Amino acid sequence: RPVAEAVATAKAVAEAVGVPLALVGPGDPQADAEVAQAVAPVLTGRRSLLGLATEENYRAVGAAALGYGHGVIASSPIDVNLAKQLNVLLTRLGLDEANLAMDPTTGALGYGLEYSYSVFERTRLAALFQNDQKMQLPIVATVGAEAWKAKESRAGEDDMPGMGDT
């Protein structure tokens, strides 16, 4: 879908709910950056979270957030060190840690929730026992995004009898 449609949708939702939003693009780093850059000025003053910022697009997403007073969802593969590295890069860009949330990727399938949870635990241990400021951030767990990638989530009653209408 066009970026203009994402902007119009974000504006309509923001006006309807009146609270800060967490806005993510379609999952492609370049497209996510384009959406963040287009949506950020429209939502000035609402302190929304823009994302997903990755190693490939953190400069563009971070600059959009910094320029218009938003926060960033920093997304990294399921790895504590990569999550910390991205947090460091975003703070060096000028974002305050208070405006960051981490998405260390949640594997509803594949790696599984257990492995994802163990990464969350190690992140919290680093934050608490090592007093690591870059890891003392809120965690965003996007479990649903991974679950919807499964073929069963898109199958209808005809494709998978007994599963119900999905």
Task: Label each PLM-derived region with a short phrase.
Residues 56-166:
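Catalytic alpha/beta core domains of metabolic enzymes, predominantly
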